């Protein structure tokens, strides 16, 4: 890992306003508890088999294909609730394109993880809330397996923030010297357009085994 300044961890209340926030459009529901109309598969018009709606939540058990939003987003404020099973591993991608075989080759990822038992818990670079393999998240804000956690991703231009349960975990600047060095030191160095799209799809990772649920997925375009 590059010896660079760690991402800033700030314990901030949920009501705090992200840097540079301005009046914006109303939130749009990407999942309303009853329909997958806002979603499809990666490079596919239909949602992958294995995702289902149960009790107002979007769920899966076992390894399935990734979901991507039908719409693309540039500057946005995304909020969702997630619940993961024991040893579970997943993620939320943002500004993803479909130029590569997999969305994670182009899109930054907000990591979703069981930090206690998942194999990826060996480093904070891959624990819950991290910008996967690029910026670490601080410990202490994740609710246990079986409980709902609340994730928030705020992206305005190159500035990105990751929030968990009302606490800002990290922030970074795409294209900065620090970001560039970290990406170069990661597995994403093989993909020259990783993280560089100004707008793209939201993605929900399904290709790891185990149970996973989402609910109350809402996004607001920032102006």
Annotate each PLM feature.
Residues 10-223:
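Carbohydrate-interacting regions of secretory-pathway proteins
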Residues 1-9:
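Bacterial N-terminal signal peptides
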